[in-house]
Amino acid sequence: MHRIDTSTAQVDKFGAGKNGFTGGNPQTGELPTALDADFFDSVQEEISSVIESSGVALDKSKKNQLVTAIKALVSSGRLLNKKIFSSSGIYSPTTGTKLIIVEAIGGGGAGGGSVATTSGQQSSGSGGASGGYVMATFTSGFAGASYIIGSGGSAANGNNGGNGSSTTFLTINAGGGSGGPVGTASAASVIAGSFGGSATGGDINAAGSNGNSGIVYTASVALGGFGGSSKIYPGNGGASRASTGDGFPATGYGCGGGGGNSGASGGARAGGIGAQGLIIIWEYS
């Protein structure tokens, strides 16, 4: 686009190099500003390009197309809202939502328990694994979609930790983490940790973190395995237990519980429970 540059333009009306228009002055002989096709073409194409770039077709009968186009161009892609879901339900998007980015975490597995011991023995369960993590973008079909939040694994004295369950939304599935295996009674043993939850259907699919091994070092030193951390809650798996007791529960969504620990001549213990999953939805215009 350009400012008026015909021979009768009012030179530097708005500052140096910023010509303007004049209606002329018969008393002084000043002519009114003449308009040429070049100027009108410039104005027409400048305005038309804004309207058409918004996807709106030019319509001679409408007088509001420029403001309609500006609103569409300025508002498109704007973050409208962030919603966090910790219980299953049906998704209702904010008015004006055209695109969503969904983050989902599966439920964490519970830590493995520990069995009863005799003198000279210890027992340490391994940590539960965290749920998988999925991120996906959707531009249609999301309004009214049902979703499921995965539950955390349960725990019981002297038993393997329970598995976490899957968190799902449309095509994505963030699998639950596996429960940790129960410890054995011995003077030295290693109980390998469980595997992280699977992740499918997203633009980003990341398996959960494995639970840590439960280890009996000697007849007097043992550690229950710590739980796996989820991708958005690092460090929130159930802590490792060095003393006799039930495993520590997970403290962040999708994380695994810690393993239980039984000292010498101790009773059976449970692992720590796994944490439930989560869905986060980012809504854009």
How would you name each of these model-derived features?
Residues 48-56, 106-111, 150-156, 173-181, ...:
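Acidic glycine-/aspartate-rich tracts in secreted/extracellular proteins
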Residues 84-86, 90, 94, 104-170, ...:
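Glycine-rich strand-loop-strand elements at beta-sheet edges
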Residues 1-74:
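Extracellular "spike/adhesin" assembly and maturation modules
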Residues 43-46, 50, 248-262:
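Right-handed beta-helix
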Residues 49-88, 176, 181-190, 194-198, ...:
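Glycine-rich, low-complexity segments
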Residues 173-248:
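Acidic, glycine-rich loop-and-strand cores that form catalytic or ligand-binding grooves
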Residues 9-14, 40, 69-75, 97-99, ...:
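Surface-exposed, low-hydrophobicity beta-strand/loop segments enriched in small/polar/acidic residues
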